[in-house]
């Protein structure tokens, strides 16, 4: 029997990789629902390839444009909707068994929660769910007895090495260091968005590419790991590994260190999660250690990467600091991508917003959303002070 799958964020890099893996196993999966932001032409192509029952676009204009395109292509039977409620409905559709949660940013929280509350199996690629609302999110996962499998390559690697979690001393999340790891510090002042998005190893969207360049992405992953594996910040370390071959490690109290290795291709963790506890073909080429690059490791430079330090600070501060961190970072990164904020001022906007707001831990989802909105407003105010355009 095939398993019905909904892909939240189908036109993004994780969504496309998921569809690539799923298409290799048509006897196991059927595409029930796809969601996207604004890439109408790409979504129409996906519809022609996979014939979902439902498609949801972020905006009504994009949805209408897609309806016209699908009609012209003879695919009028595909239902097209738009907006946040339609996103949630896609995640909880009766024909959906499993949900790939791959919407980037805070926008992914509500539809992913809808999937959890509907009892779907959830593949979590949206780290903001745990960064913004970790306690509430995991509480819902336990309440609804949902199977939650991590998709981020680092957390998937830890999951594969973690076993039952007994005897774990610490986990080590690896990081490539991004495109600017070896750049002279004075050159960072004139970094452009295109340079920041040119990741040396991974193919990713623009927002997550900038987060990788600042190492905020690794900071968010530290917070995510805290909730996924129930470990304090003191037992989560970050190691720079420029080759992105070792995806993370788990150290045990007896001195053993288990590592998960593989070529840097998101189809590997996706296939692992989709097949768990079995294995399936992913299309990823075999790792050739004999002819590959030498493996290097170094500690992260927190002076060069202040966003990583800010994320650790937010996790240790508790309360809603991580929610504030995430909201301020989204505002700052978007401003950088639009040319309104220099690269080196991203961390300053986040730090100033964290310094101004110290809200208590949220008791309800509405509290999370209110804190997120307030943090965005405060970040915009600080952006006006720091944002002098590209230097």
Swiss-Prot record:
It comes from the Bacteria. InterPro entries: DXP_reductoisomerase (IPR003821), DXP_reductoisomerase_C (IPR013644), DXP_reductoisomerase_N (IPR013512), DXPR_C (IPR026877), DXPR_C_sf (IPR036169), NAD(P)-bd_dom_sf (IPR036291). Pathway: Isoprenoid biosynthesis; isopentenyl diphosphate biosynthesis via DXP pathway; isopentenyl diphosphate from 1-deoxy-D-xylulose 5-phosphate: step 1/6. One of its GO terms (biological process) is isopentenyl diphosphate biosynthetic process, methylerythritol 4-phosphate pathway involved in terpenoid biosynthetic process. One of its GO terms (molecular function) is NADPH binding. Mn(2+) binds at residues 152, 154, 221. Its cofactor is Mg(2+); Mn(2+). SUPFAM superfamilies: 1-deoxy-D-xylulose-5-phosphate reductoisomerase, C-terminal domain, Glyceraldehyde-3-phosphate dehydrogenase-like, C-terminal domain, NAD(P)-binding Rossmann-fold domains. This is 1-deoxy-D-xylulose 5-phosphate reductoisomerase. It comes from Acidithiobacillus ferrooxidans (strain ATCC 53993 / BNL-5-31) (Leptospirillum ferrooxidans (ATCC 53993)).
């Amino acid at each position: 029997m095939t398993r019905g799958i909904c892909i939240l964020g189908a036109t993004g890099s994780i969504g496309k990789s998921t569809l690539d893996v799923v298409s290799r196993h048509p006897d196991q999966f059927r595409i029930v629902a796809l969601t996207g932001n604004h890439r109408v032409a790409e979504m129409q192509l996906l519809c022609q390839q996979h014939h979902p029952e439902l498609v949801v676009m972020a905006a009504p204009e994009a949805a209408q444009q897609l309806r016209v395109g699908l009609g012209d292509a003879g695919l009028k039977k595909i239902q097209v909707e738009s907006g946040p409620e339609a996103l949630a409905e896609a995640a909880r559709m009766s024909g959906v068994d499993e949900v790939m949660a791959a919407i980037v940013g805070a926008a992914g929280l509500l539809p992913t929660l809808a999937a959890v509350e509907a009892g779907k199996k959830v593949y979590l690629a949206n780290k903001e769910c745990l960064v913004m609302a970790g306690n509430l999110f995991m509480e819902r996962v336990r309440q609804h007895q949902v199977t939650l499998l991590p998709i981020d390559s680092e957390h998937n690697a830890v999951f594969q090495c973690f076993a039952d979690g007994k005897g774990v001393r610490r986990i080590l999340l690896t990081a490539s260091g991004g495109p600017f790891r070896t750049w002279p510090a004075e050159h960072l002042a004139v970094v452009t968005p295109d340079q920041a998005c040119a990741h040396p190893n991974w193919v990713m969207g623009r927002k997550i590419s900038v987060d990788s360049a600042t190492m905020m992405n690794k900071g968010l992953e530290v917070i995510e790991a805290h909730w996924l594996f129930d470990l304090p910040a003191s037992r989560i370390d970050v190691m720079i590994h420029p080759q992105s071959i070792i995806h993370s490690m788990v150290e045990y109290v007896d001195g053993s260190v288990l590592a998960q290795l593989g070529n840097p291709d998101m189809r590997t963790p996706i296939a692992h999660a989709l097949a768990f506890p079995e294995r399936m073909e992913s299309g990823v080429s075999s790792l050739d250690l004999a002819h590959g690059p030498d493996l290097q490791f170094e500690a992260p430079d927190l002076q060069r990467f202040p966003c990583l330090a800010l994320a650790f600070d937010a996790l240790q501060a508790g309360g809603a600091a991580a929610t504030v961190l995430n909201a301020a970072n989204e505002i700052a990164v978007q401003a950088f991508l639009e040319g309104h904020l220099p690269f080196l001022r991203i961390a300053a906007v986040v730090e100033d917003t964290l310094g101004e707001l110290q809200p208590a831990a949220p008791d309800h989802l509405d509290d999370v959303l209110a804190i997120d909105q307030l943090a965005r407003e405060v970040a915009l105010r600080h952006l006006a002070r720091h944002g002098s355009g590209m230097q």
